[in-house]
Regions:
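Transmembrane helix-loop junctions in multi-pass membrane proteins
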Residues: 182-187, 212-215
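Hydrophobic, small-residue-rich membrane helices and short re-entrant helix-turn-helix hairpins
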Residues: 75-81, 210-221
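Alpha-helical transmembrane segments and terminal signal-anchor/GPI-anchor hydrophobic tails
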Residues: 217-249
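Alpha-helical transmembrane segments of integral membrane proteins
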Residues: 4, 8-11, 196-199, 225
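Juxtamembrane membrane-interface segments at transmembrane alpha-helix termini
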Residues: 90-95, 207-217, 233
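Membrane-cytosol interface segments of multi-pass membrane proteins
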Residues: 1-179, 187-191, 239-247
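Transmembrane alpha-helices and membrane-interface helical segments
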Residues: 66-69, 150, 200-215
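Alpha-helical transmembrane segments of multi-pass integral membrane proteins
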Residues: 109-122, 190-211, 224, 233
C-alpha cells in the first residue's frame, strides 16, 4: 500500500531543494559557479543555512524507506534492474549528453576557463560534464546505496531489520551523534556533494528503522521531544506524519 505521508515528505523536500538552488546562485560567500550577492545584506542566506544540514539527508532517509517498501513486493533482482534502468543509465547518459552545458555556464560564470586554456579539449569536456552534474549526484549515490543494500540483505537475512523494529524514542534520539559521526566520513575532496558517510547512513536508517510503522507510531507520540533534541530526519518524518498537517495534501 502506498504511504501518502512519505510522498508528502518527498515533494515538500524537493520544493525546498529547488528554492535552495535558486537562492544559492546569489549567495554572499562568492563560491565559484554562482552569480554572487544581490544586496549588501543577504537576508535570504539564512534560508540556505537553515535547510542545508538536513534536507538532502531527509531525501535519502525517504529513499531508504521507499526501497524497503519496494522490496516487500519485489525480488532483489527486480529491484536491481529497476534501480539500474531508472538511476544509473539516465544519470550516466545525462551527464555527458546534457549536463556538460550546465557545467559550461558554471565554469564561464566562475571564470574557470581563464586558467584552463592549455587543457586538452576532451579533458575539458569531462571537467565541464562533472561541473554541471547538478542533481545527478543524488541518483548516482542512490544507485550505489541500492547495490550495497542488496549485499546487506543477502548477509543479514532481515535479522537486523526485525531488530530495528523495536527502536524506541531513546534509541532514535541516539541517532543524532550517529549522523554527526557519519558526516565526518567518506567525503570526496573535490566534488563535495559525494558524501557517502552521512547520506549512506540516512539511506540505511530509512530502510532499517523508519520503514517500520511501529517506529513511526512511537515517533509520532514523541515528536516534541525529537524537535527539541535535534534536527535529524526523524523529526521531520514525524512532523510530516501528523494528520492535522498533511491530511488531504
Amino acid at each position: 500500500m502506498r504511504k501518502t505521508y512519505v510522498d508528502n515528505i518527498r515533494w515538500m523536500t524537493v520544493v525546498l531543494v529547488v528554492m535552495y538552488h535558486a537562492l544559492y546562485m546569489f549567495n554572499s560567500v562568492g563560491i565559484g559557479g554562482a552569480i554572487g550577492p544581490l544586496m549588501p545584506v543577504q537576508v535570504q542566506d539564512a534560508f540556505l543555512y537553515a535547510v542545508y544540514p538536513w534536507f538532502m539527508l531527509l531525501l535519502f532517509v525517504v529513499s531508504g524507506m521507499s526501497a524497503r517498501f519496494y522490496l516487500n513486493q519485489h525480488s532483489g533482482r527486480e529491484f536491481l534492474k529497476s534501480r539500474t534502468t531508472k538511476l544509473l543509465v539516465p544519470s550516466t547518459i545525462g551527464l555527458f549528453v546534457f549536463f556538460w552545458i550546465a557545467g559550461y555556464y558554471n565554469m564561464r560564470i566562475g571564470g574557470a576557463f581563464e586558467s584552463m586554456s592549455a587543457v586538452p579539449g576532451p579533458v575539458l569536456f569531462v571537467i565541464m560534464a562533472f561541473s554541471g552534474i547538478g542533481p545527478l549526484w543524488y541518483i548516482q549515490l542512490l544507485w550505489v546505496f541500492s547495490v550495497l543494500l542488496l549485499a546487506v540483505r543477502r548477509v543479514g537475512k532481515d535479522r537486523l531489520y526485525r531488530l530495528c523494529e523495536k527502536a524506541n524514542l531513546p534509541v532514535l534520539l541516539c541517532l543524532t551523534p550517529v549522523i554527526w559521526g557519519a558526516a565526518q566520513l567518506l567525503n570526496t575532496p573535490v566534488i563535495v556533494v559525494y558524501r557517502f558517510g552521512i547520506y549512506g547512513a540516512g539511506f540505511f536508517l530509512g530502510y532499517l528503522i523508519f520503514s517500520h510503522d511501529a517506529v513511526m507510531d512511537r515517533l509520532e507520540k514523541g515528536w516534541l521531544v525529537d524537535c527539541q533534541a535535534s534536527a535529524t530526519p526523524k523529526n521531520t518524518s514525524k512532523g510530516e506524519r501528523q494528520p492535522s498537517l498533511l491530511r488531504g495534501l
